[in-house]
């Protein structure tokens, strides 16, 4: 029989790539999406036109991890073999404006799913998406599975709670419940408010002449950037292990924001010249002096 997977957060970057990966693996995939007044499935719309994917193996359900009734009902109806919890309010800055909502979604959301698994079928495998923001004010570099957490935002704190409640339920109820602590992972499906997409979009506009400036913060800030397609494969592999464990998922390489800007400019054919230092450092397009 085909395996059945349930994805919370199916309309996000990771949910879209994971759906396509699992469908090509022969899974039956169910995704949970929130009701919205505007179209919010653009990342997964191409599933229906991909010749390598059987469209009748993909199903969408309305639900929300902030609502325990919908979480339980969907899991009870589908009876999945694997559940991937990718649903989250994932913006660090926004978590300071909406700390209660972030906690309700990112922390309690995981708890609601775990409680449903305990009540419905303890054999269901569970993957919880963690974040490098859980490390926060890092106590060692590089970080690994044994590095202590020191979150510096409501988002990071909520993810730490989800991490530990997953481990607690694994040990208390003998569940196959796992955590993946993901470092930054990008793709063309990444939200436009994230720095990589912000840079690409702004520089394309400058190249096309519809804009002249891009404002950034600390361009020497470094990030471990991977590709989302690779990271969803890691998620799947975690649930194929013989025993449930927790893993850090990263590229183990760091690049500065400035390096990323230079790389995008090179691909666009923009010869960038940097002048000044500190907060006054600016990059100019040599050809057009902008």
Predicted regions, residues:
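C-terminal substrate-binding subdomain of Rossmann-fold SDR/epimerase-dehydratase oxidoreductases
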Residues: 18, 24, 31-39, 55, ...
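N-terminal Rossmann-like NAD(P)+-binding domain of SDR-like oxidoreductases, especially those catalyzing
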Residues: 1-187, 229, 235, 239, ...
